[in-house]
Amino acid sequence: MKLLSSWVVAALAAQAAGAAISHKLDGFTIREHADPAKRALLQKYVTWDEHSIFVNGERLMIFSGEVHPYRLPVASLYIDIFEKVKALGFNCVSFYVDWALLEGNPGHYSAEGIFDLQPFFDAAKEAGIYLLARPGPYINAEVSGGGFPGWLQRVDGILRTSDEAYLKATDNYASNIAATIAKAQITNGGPIILYQPENEYSGACCGYNGFPDGSYMQYIEDHARDAGIVVPFISNDAWAAGHNAPGTGAGAVDIYGHDSYPLGFDCANPSTWPSGNLPTYFHTSHEQQSPSTPYSLVEFQGGAFDPWGGVGFAKCAALLNHEFERVFYKNDFSFGVAFLNLYMIFGGTNWGNLGHPGGYTSYDYGSAISESRNITREKYSELKLLGNFAKVSPGYLVANPGDLSTSTYTNTADLTVTPLLGSNSSASSFFVIRHSDYSSQASVEYKLTVPTSAGNLTIPQLGGSLTLSGRDSKIHVTDYDVAGTNILYSTAEVFTWKKFNNEKVLVLYGGPGEHHEFAVSGASSSSVVEGSSSGISSKKVGKALVVAWDVSTARRIVQVGSLKVFLLDRNSAYNYWVPQVPTKGTAPGYSNQETTASSIIVKAGYLVRSAYLDGNDLHIQADFNATTPIEVVGAPSGAKNLVINGKKTQTKVDKNGIWSASVAYTAPKVQLPSLKSLKWKSVDTLPEAKNTYDDSAWTSADHAYTNNSAHSLQTPTSLFASDYGYHTGALLFRGHFTANGKEKTFFVQTKGGTAYGHSIWINETYVGSWAGTSINDNNNATYTLPTLQSGKNYVITVVIDNMGLDEDWTIGSEDMKNPRGIIQYSLSGQEASAISWKLTGNLGGENYRDTVRGPLNEGGLYAERQGFHQPQPPTQKWDSSSPFTGLTKPGIRFYSTSFDLDLPSGYDIPLYFNFGNSTSTPAAYRVQLYVNGYQYGKYVNNIGPQTSFPVPEGILNYHGTNWLALSLWAQEDNGAKLDSFELINTTPVLTSLGEVKSVNQPKYQARKGAY
């Protein structure tokens, strides 16, 4: 589209976004900005009314999942995630951008290599997935600093406010990232349809009285508009508070949205659903706060975070499981949600120190797609049922949500029904039923009374009862349109429907042991054309044919006129997929009326990625983890042959026109090295604890002040690491003094974030350690010193494990400025000023050396500063020793080895590095895992919980040499060693995924100035 001149753009962007005008499209009111020039500037591709968003003029339910590209730094794997999201029936992905990774050095923006967003955009477009861009500048996201680079600790102003110093600090990043996103907008042929400024701008504390500040939000929005952002702004209030909703003045967004995590994060008790946690007021609050925009849940719970010392993400997945999805997501549908984004759909990994101290390396999140990218959790399959239902139910978007009732629609107060009643545009109505006690595990029988075009009906009409099992919810439909055939009602849930040539197919499913009915208006008879007729009966009631059926594990197909109704149990429905078949080319395209209509129905196993027609050949791209029967329902009329993953497959066609075939799966032989048998070389990575060590090249901690406006000094000079440009990984401090012989004890308070630890030496004598806990982010300790000789020079060496910077979720808290380093200290018999300090972190600090792996990947250990964690380190003069032998005293040692892999091609083989502990009381030690130079694991043996570290192909070279390195930090008198350390695989998946390309893995080169 044609953009206006830059000065006009700037002028328009500075206007408040509160006012709106409307016009009519097919009977619906579409909201746009009041200023004609601004409307021209903004675009016509993405519009909205009170019911939904329109994309290219078509009403669209946006069903989305959260994916963070920076948590999967292998660009050729993006398509894998997008195709798995697409297969759910979803049409969108939301993504954050982590400022800390792109501007680690203030004023120097770098988004190249693994940080380049263009491959992410390209993969989304290839898969047919729209994007919501969420670049902050603040993102929270359980990343270090909430996405703020560490140097913001030195900004003299309150973060996330209109303080000039803070706003100026955001300018470079904000302009660059918005310009990048602008190029990928739908207006430029890209996938981005929405843009979120800021993140959860929802509350303040600690004496800050400037919230909410519309001028601050307006500044963030203007930056985006100035850089070319023209798609609508959407917000994500942390709760339904109405902040920055349209009409609120400066800083108002186009579409108001909010977040919700109703079941919380108590993964330790995955079967506990606390009373009162199911929201019931969202529709009411939406009508009060933003009635002119579609109801949007921009973050709704898709999993949970887990802290250090937690119970692990398997239990988070159990807490937020398939039952949670049925009850809570269908409850969201009862409010008429039109934009639903699940946080997370794929979590990924906090590699390279990018996480905050409240979490560990894994960011699996218990999400539908696991950290290792598998989709074996039942919640993925359950989500597929709902996603595909939404995709083929356009009437839902214009149905009117009503009030919940325990008496109007059922014959028992044990159940609650919320109606979404048909409108002038669509007669379809939807009735969301759940237990009144949403956590109930009881099975309740009921009858349903609902309004239909045939009058009020009490169902079942042919006898029997309906059943709602414990922790279940259903969406019953009435007057549901299937390509012109009116389904008067169905108590079984709709998975999908399609029209194929002159035939229509409707797929219904129910839970085990349930009884259901559906009725077809105008029909008079039915026949069972596949499967047993046992448990199926039909009768004409009024002007509709009613079919009653009992759920069975065996599929039945009932023919009613030109409609074939597939009757499935839920577990069987899990194996069905609905890939779009493009009319041109091989890419599925974005979801719209045309591409949805072109879809086929495929019964398969693990995953169906896509389908396309090439001449007479119907191609299906699919993944398999077992020998799998394949069925194709609705093969295109021109298709004669079935080609699966490039191989022509023998098929049979039954009397119902269903193609059947089989794909054989043979588990490949996967040969992995024994890590214990490898030749390991090692080097002391704490030479600082030797009397001969020279720290003259270190940074002098000589600031008699701090630039941290939120924390005052308690030491003669600042020992806050970020004051000197060190923000990530291990921090080392060396305090020099001349003894007077009176020194008996050393008191120190250190701060490194939750689960951190420290160790202290004086000269070469070990003084003690803080091994850390799962809840403490700082520690006060007094250590007894050996006898010191008067007049002799001594050095106190303090090593601190920086676990990341705190987030800044509440405005005014300034939590992100919580320092890392030494907060206070005292040496008995000496003034504090008698000690002169030096410090270091990663080599170069903000002028970080490894620009390929980014500003956070390496910390301040000697081996890291030298670059020994990279491939091909200079190990010729190192000791031959193994981490399985380890250290016999406190210290830190660095180990390196290499191994070759040549894994079977054509399989997606998840690999994990697993640590084991054979002692009942875990020893206190810490390990960093480096794979080809990338820090892909931070293991704290005495805190946990993570012991298994998945590393994706692309970081690991599946067909070549790999360099593996470990730092082993022993914090006990008897040292530490690894009891067990293995490389393992889980089930290989026969895959249609293309080649996975290894990321750039720069090898070791001697670093100028390294110390």
From Swiss-Prot:
Annotated transmembrane regions: none
Alphabetical UniProt keywords: Carbohydrate metabolism, Disulfide bond, Glycoprotein, Glycosidase, Hydrolase, Polysaccharide degradation, Secreted, Signal
The protein, known as: Beta-galactosidase A
Cell compartment(s), UniProt: Secreted
Signal sequence annotation: 1-19
Quaternary data: Monomer.
GO cellular component: extracellular region; extracellular space
SUPFAM superfamilies: (Trans)glycosidases (SSF51445), Beta-galactosidase LacA, domain 3 (SSF117100), Galactose-binding domain-like (SSF49785), Glycosyl hydrolase domain (SSF51011)
EC number assigned by the record: 3.2.1.23
Source species: Penicillium sp
Glycosylation sites: 374, 456, 625, 707, 763, 780, 917
